[in-house]
Amino acid sequence: MEDKCLIVILGATGDLTKKKLIPAIHNLVANKKIKDFAVVGVGRAHSNPKLILKKSKKYVEKLNKKTWSTLEKRMYYFQADFYDNIGFCKLEEFTKSIEKKHKLPGNRIFYLATLPSHFKAIADNLSRCGLTKEKIRRKQGFKKNWTKVVFEKPFGHDLKSAKKINKCIKKVFKEKQIYRIDHYLGKE
């Protein structure tokens, strides 16, 4: 990934973030796949970036101290309830301030490391508060930007619920923005 971007992890205090996402971001930075970035963890629990990173550290296989130091300087935490529209509007202001601080161009990846029951509320609040709107960010001075959203498996508990979730998120995002993944598919 050559583009500068902000990575927003919703569900930042959970196991997926601790065991998989933070170690993966560490590896991307260590392997020079991303250079100019920042990470905003979002969760309902009271936390902070230092605590999230501390809990993740033991899951990084080949810890690079310089990379870890970079991650410590570029990781932030924002407490918000996934069902609170006002909290998400404050998150928009927070993300803009982080993008400005790190001179990021408005490219955003939203990673929903949450239960599928939260997907609709999160997608609606991201959209309602302008967090995913590329056109709005262009008006704010970000020339050319993109938004991606990652939905982590399980994607519903059966076919009916998966279709319902898919219908909801397609009201908010274009198909080219959506990534549905299963991190276990890569395991041997």
Residue ranges and their predicted role:
Residues M1-F151, F155-E188:
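Secretory/organelle targeting and membrane-embedding segments
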